Amino acid sequence: MTTSEDQTTPAHLDPKTYPRHLTDPTQNIHLELTYSPLNAQSALDKISSPAAGANVLFLGTTRNTFEDRAVSQLSYTAYPPLTLKTLAGIARDAVAKHGLTGIVIAHRLGVVPIREASIVIAVSSGHRRAAWRAGEEVLEICKEKAEIWKREEFVDGGMEWRENRERDGEGKKVVVSEN
């Protein structure tokens, strides 16, 4: 029989091996997976550019209810090498499609208390329309494709694992095809 002290945590799950970053300075792409609170100002600082006339920032925060059940906190897990690869593809596609001058995608892992941010999306572009569209599109694609799993923990003691893509931007259930 072994105790929890005898077992070693795999490196990809060990909070001591974080933060995980991926940066592409040629396209001003900044990606992060971290157990620490997310910093909105840091994200804005990274995308700031003299060529940018628009900076858009989105913070996804933990709310206190889900379908009339009181939520105590959320918890997120991921496989960082795969998740960062997916996020890099999303960021590169957004830069190319919308002509962005910068993009940050940062996601928190582990426990995220009520009112704290679990995701930061920050984008900059020459004009507002491209930035608005890119910010929303990046968020929706991250929820659909990024290998990040969420556990909702309820005040009544229950919990449920969810895929981010189970709900649309208005919180309505999405039917996911198995094909």
From Swiss-Prot:
One GO process term, biological-process aspect: Mo-molybdopterin cofactor biosynthetic process
Record key words, sorted: Cytoplasm, Molybdenum cofactor biosynthesis, Transferase
Keyword Transferase listed: yes
Subcellular localization, as worded in the UniProt entry: Cytoplasm
Reaction catalysed by this enzyme: 2 [molybdopterin-synthase sulfur-carrier protein]-C-terminal-Gly-aminoethanethioate + cyclic pyranopterin phosphate + H2O = molybdopterin + 2 [molybdopterin-synthase sulfur-carrier protein]-C-terminal Gly-Gly + 2 H(+)
Pfam families in the record: MoaE
Cited function: Catalytic subunit of the molybdopterin synthase complex, a complex that catalyzes the conversion of precursor Z into molybdopterin. Acts by mediating the incorporation of 2 sulfur atoms from thiocarboxylated MOCS2A into precursor Z to generate a dithiolene group.
Protein name: Molybdopterin synthase catalytic subunit
UniProt source species: Aspergillus oryzae (strain ATCC 42149 / RIB 40) (Yellow koji mold)
Gene behind this protein: cnxH
